[in-house]
Design a protein with these regions (language model features):
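N-terminal secretory signal peptides and thylakoid transit peptides that target proteins
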Residues: 1-15
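Serine-esterase "nucleophile elbow" of acetyl-processing enzymes
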Residues: 27-81, 97-105, 109
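Alpha-helical cap/lid subdomain in secreted, periplasmic
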Residues: 95-240, 244-259, 275-276
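Short, low-complexity, Pro/Ser/Thr/Gly-rich segments in the mature regions of secreted, periplasmic
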Residues: 270-278
């Protein structure tokens, strides 16, 4: 599968954030090879909730765009997440192969799918949580391990859904449970973004979560002249929120070491989020 110019441009964002630092190895394996120091990379496979967004979609923001703010300068992020993809279609389109081509020993491979796996009426994307979903996820784990990298499963972040009494509602069915079960079976770390985000949305409530999602008044953004009420995708504040909880969870799971993370409790100004021009 050949990559489009836009996908190639997104891949350029994978360049390490700095070129001089000793790799931090939370897993305790591997050291500098050949006398040199190589920064590690976090490779992200996922869907539109994590994907790089461009100027024609602003202010919609994938949480993968905000993840570098919480990582040390010796870590890079290769954001391969793409709108509309499931664990199945990402593989079938050759995107997993493209991601794995850039993976090196001791890198991390972050895997978050679920939103589009739920679309079981679409044969190109839909999976069954306890069979095909797990089977496809195993391909990501296998590919990472074959390259002596460290896979991490991430349950799908929750949508903004509230019951009439203000209770935040789960929306992903059995997919998070199936991923947690697979993580236990395969003995890989899992970031339970579904549970973490659901609890966070509950604390913030309907009004407090609205600024995190891509809700826009008519005329507020030239990209959405009629406004928008999107309870799935994020604005910068929401992307920062999810990236922060992900970085903290990676630390707690010992997928990252304390020296690998920063700003976990510090504000991140939204103006630091930028959207490249479409390729």
């Amino acid at each position: 599968v050949s990559l489009t110019r836009r996908q190639t441009a997104a891949a350029l964002l994978a360049l390490p954030l700095a070129l001089t630092a000793t790799p931090a190895l939370a897993h305790g394996g591997g050291g500098p090879r050949g006398g040199g120091h190589r920064p590690r990379t976090l490779h992200l496979a996922g869907d539109s909730t994590a994907a790089q967004k461009y100027a024609d979609a602003a202010p919609e923001t994938g949480w993968g765009m905000a993840l570098p703010f919480f990582l040390g300068p010796h870590l890079g992020v290769a954001n391969h997440a793409v709108n509309g993809r499931s664990s199945k279609s990402f593989v079938d389109e050759g995107r997993l192969t493209a991601l794995l081509d850039g993976v090196r020993p001791d890198d991390l491979v972050l895997i978050q799918f679920g939103h589009n796996d739920e679309k079981t009426e679409d044969p190109a994307r839909g999976t069954d949580p306890w069979t095909t979903y797990q089977e496809y996820l195993r391909l990501y784990l296998k590919g990472a391990r074959e390259r002596r990298a460290h896979p991490v499963l991430i349950t799908p972040v929750e949508r903004r859904r509230f019951a009439d009494d203000g209770t935040a509602r789960p929306t992903h069915g059995q997919y998070p449970a199936a991923m947690r079960a697979l993580a236990a079976e395969e003995r890989v770390p899992v970031v339970d973004a579904q549970a973490l985000s659901l609890a966070r949305w509950q604390r913030l409530g309907p009004d407090g979560t609205e600024p995190l999602f891509n809700w826009l008044e008519p005329g507020e953004s030239p990209n959405y002249p009629d406004g928008r009420q999107d309870n799935t995708h994020f604005r910068p504040a929401g992307a920062v929120e999810v990236a922060r909880m992900t970085a903290r969870a990676l630390l707690e799971a010992r997928a990252l070491a304390p020296r690998d993370v920063r700003r976990l409790d510090a504000p991140v100004p939204e103006h630091l989020i930028t959207w490249p021009r479409p390729a």
